[in-house]
Amino acid sequence: MARFDRGSVSGVACGLDVPAIEVRGLSFAYPGATAPVFDGLDWTVPQGAFALLVGGTGSGKSTLLSLLKPEIAPAGERAGELRVLGEDVADMDVRASAERVGYVFQDPENQIVCETVWHEMAFGLENLGVSRDEMRRRVAETSYFFGLEDWLHRDTDTLSGGRKQLLSLAAVLALRPRVLLLDEPTSQLDPVAEKNFLHALFRVNRELGCTVVVATHQPRPMLEYATCAYRIEGGRVREVADLASLGGREELLASDACQSAPGAAPGAAAIREGWFRYDRAAGWVLRGLDVAFSAGAVHAIVGGNGCGKSTMLSVLAKTAKLQRGRMMRGAASAALLPQNPKALLVAETVRDELMEWASTCGYDEAAAQEQAARLGLASLEARHPYDLSGGQRQLLALAKLLLIGPELLLLDEPTKGLDLASRRIIARALRDHAKAGGAVVMATHDLDFAEQVSDDVAMMFDGEIACMEPPADFFVDNVFYRA
């Protein structure tokens, strides 16, 4: 792909001294909110930067980025100026927005709309009225740049999470935006897929001259590519003077918090010779899976996107049934937190969400308020769940499940989109659940979390468990899967 022309956008002069992003005096409040998200925020990002945007869960990172993209900007009261390459965002039509600003969401499922990779690549170009010849040229060129040509005719729903996120990036860049905004783009990727995605993003920045801004809670893997970083806190943005300061490894729990009770623990669930596939014409996702999980412990499952982790959790939750083999859970109650917490959120307010199962599960409002406070949700009870940040929705969904007290707690990527403080809250909650005799099984790409919080770590590969060991033994000899 040719280097994007930094000198102009749609024929409008745009010198290198013009910032890629310029925000002046931005104030913004969601409808019905008691306090604004931003109050007089100023922010400037130079052209050609690979910039990181860090900050706590709910600090406004996603809100700030989405306000720069008119088509997805949230409703609310707004004041101040937002400019991209010198043009006011409020004056951009759909074409101008597409040519200036590309946006990649945290979850590729929220972005991919077409059945095949080729059609997904062409979808945005079709909507802009690009000629068929130009469309084919751009799809071909972008596919070669990202190495998509071997799976160009695959169905999008057959792709791994890593490939879906790479496809989302490629489809956006086929529109040739000058500024690329990404919201937690690697939070659902395994370590190898994350490295591949970040390398592709680095090439976009360096080889194509595209300004890249990544909102993230996990900046450490990106520091080798970043040219600058900004922290959002208290409704304001400030530049991080020392990039290396973002690379430290933080403790999640006290050193003795993961000590299990002595003695043999009773079994909570097991799968024996489990085979499962989603379609008779498709390949097996689980292939003779043998695994057992004990009560009173936190079990972490790691492995590449598409290796079968989520499927195994669905089998344990009885939302999927093995075609061969047995799943043994006895009378133990179970609850599953899926990758997308929105699947559990149906009410109009946080309070109503927490009280949804109160009558059937036997807890009162005092218990709900206590759980909300424990998970950092006490000040959000009047908010609509969909007005929360992705991390706050994750905490809310977990709070709902903890209120019903399942003996088997199943979690699919429980820490995605969470800052250090929120990860600590979840770590403590999972250890407390295990200490009370519950079993926790979590599929995760957060290796630091797995090492510090779990009693054992299993690697899933090709539908089976390749190994299961205590964290100290599991991580010692790994090359790619290292905490």
Q: Where is each model-derived feature located?
A:
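Conserved ABC transporter NBD signature motif
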Residues: 77-88, 325-334
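Conserved ABC ATPase "signature" region
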Residues: 134-151, 363-380
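Conserved beta-strand-loop-alpha-helix hinge in the C-terminal portion
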Residues: 236-256, 464-483
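Conserved ABC ATPase signature
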Residues: 155-159, 384-388, 392
